[in-house]
Amino acid sequence: MEYKTHDLSKQSCSVSAALLFQAGEWMYIEKISLKGYRNLNEMTIDLKNGINIFYGANAQGKTNFLEAIYICASGRSLRTRNDSQLIHFDAPESHIQIHIKKENRNDKIDIHLKKENKKGIAVNGIPIKKLGDLFGTCHAVIFSPEDLNLIKEGPGERRRFMDMEICQMDAVYYYNLQ
């Protein structure tokens, strides 16, 4: 299998993106642009079908880059509930944009974050009113050290994890959880 590497200490370059499968439909992220997001103040990366390898020294933004993708899939950070913490310290707001290529269509997700903890989400240029309307556009599963709680903690933690993953594939499931 072909792969390319990407050093996150550079501002912009071309890399390969992992091919994702969901219910027989393939998808991959073609492009991601970040502006005013955590320590990745401004970057655009064009992705191609294949495998991603992101590398760099500590505190270069590898986890922040993956978190930005997760936010586009779920509408939420995996590390904080306070969206203002996602904004670069000297920026008034943050913007995340991803272009997704799917078997039958292309989608674009825009996330705008403001210091007042205001968030705007648009799919293909259309603002969404409910978080559940985002689900199904981009699929992402992230495992972090905190996910060891899936094994250590009780069944409630495992249910929460599975609920969030299923919500990405079925917005109706999300609304039924409410």
Language model regions located:
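Short, cationic motifs built from Arg/Lys/His that form the positively charged side of catalytic pockets
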Residues: 38, 158-159
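Short coil-to-helix segment of the ABC ATPase nucleotide-binding domain corresponding to the Q-loop/switch region
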Residues: 66, 157-158
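Nucleotide-state sensing region of NTPase/ATPase domains
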Residues: 73-149, 155-157, 163-169, 173
